[in-house]
Amino acid sequence: MKGYRILIVEDDVMIGDLLQKILQREGYRVIWKTDGADVLSVIQKVDLVIMDVMLPGEDGYQMSAKIKKLGLGIPVIFLSARNDMDSKLQGLQIGEDYMVKPFDPRELLLRMRNMLEHHYGTFTQIKHLYIDAVTKKVFNESLHDEVLFTAIERKIFFYLYENRDSILTKEHFFEYLWQLEDRNPNIVNVHIKKIRAKINDQAGEMIENIYGEGYRLNTVVKK
């Protein structure tokens, strides 16, 4: 589950700081806001929201309603000191989960993992990319930022992915991409360059050019 982007909206500095450290230690990427003022400006960059109900200004329920209107399908876990049934039911009607403070971080992590698996399924991650080999979709940074490949770019990328960590020569590409009647060797280079730009790999760390041989999609990228 590592690599998912989590937005924490919590005005209690002690709780917010603790949550941020715990989630980062588990491999999550965290954005922390102390109120809902600019939540909507970052919401498209995250995969899950952990939100306090009692916030300065608009409360968590109001902010969650605004998030849902965007139609992004981002799950929300509410945190609240209110333990009465009416508060719990209200939270569960608006968000996906409701946890009462104080809570056990281990329980929160388990609920988060289950929620992320339920909403997003299982993706393969390479550096900042999320790759779904079933739907043939690729996402940059967040699961709400799909890479918009052309048909030929998608075919090339997933050919590399299916043969990841192996070198594919230009002849391999020509044989696989039968619709490429133009056997100009540069045609492969052109498409690879466009793919790299779309996946933020201009340096060629993920899709590496092996001089004199071909290209390789690296699953382990050197830092």
UniProtKB/Swiss-Prot annotation:
Q: What is the lineage of its organism?
A: Bacteria, Bacillati, Bacillota, Bacilli, Bacillales
Q: What is this protein called?
A: Uncharacterized transcriptional regulatory protein YbdJ
Query: What are the 4-aspartylphosphate sites (modified residues) in this protein?
Result: D52
Report which gene this protein is encoded by: ybdJ
Tell me the CDD domains matching this sequence. Answer: REC_OmpR, trans_reg_C
Where does it primarily localize?
cytoplasm
DNA-binding region(s) from the entry = 121-219
For this protein, the record's PROSITE patterns field holds: OMPR_PHOB, RESPONSE_REGULATORY
Residue ranges constituting the Response regulatory domain according to the UniProt record: 5-116
A GO cellular component annotated for this chain's UniProt record is: cytosol
Query: GO biological process: any one?
Result: regulation of DNA-templated transcription
